Amino acid sequence: MTASAKEEYGFFGKWWQFAKERFDPFSHSLMISLFIVAHYVVVAVDLGKKFPADFGGEGAWRHFALALGVCAFFFKLRLYDEIKDYEVDCEINRDRPLVRGLVTHKDLYSGIAVCIATEVITFGLLGTAALVAIVFSIAYSLLMYKEFFIGEQ
């Protein structure tokens, strides 16, 4: 990608273009919504409550925080995958955003840091149990990113 093409997108534009290409907003929003609703159903059944839970009123911010945190988690997994697949993409998928220069490795590492911060903040707002759960999830995702530190066979 040329410098003028990078300038054409701008900071937010390049991330929006990346998301459109590699983290389709519609399909991922649907998947994340179903993921969250499934968890709400499990909790409601476990607590013997009816579903759906109260989504309005003063507690609505909690649902928004949860959705934002879960979205950040899944987006972070996409960023990990982009970095891990870079060498293969250079040979096979030359149209990918990282390979063609829409985003850089530094951009993706910065995006990962922002996602982790978003996860910690949003889940922290939801209470200690949620914070502990996301910290374990982040740790596990980092192990996955490093493939459990297993070298190539």
What positions do the PLM features span?
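Juxtamembrane membrane-interface segments at transmembrane alpha-helix termini
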Residues: L143-Q153
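Hydrophobic alpha-helical transmembrane segments
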Residues: M1-L77, K84-R94, S110-Y145
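Catalytic micro-motifs at enzyme active sites that drive phosphoryl/nucleotidyl and oxygen chemistry
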Residues: I83-Y86, L98-V99, G151-E152
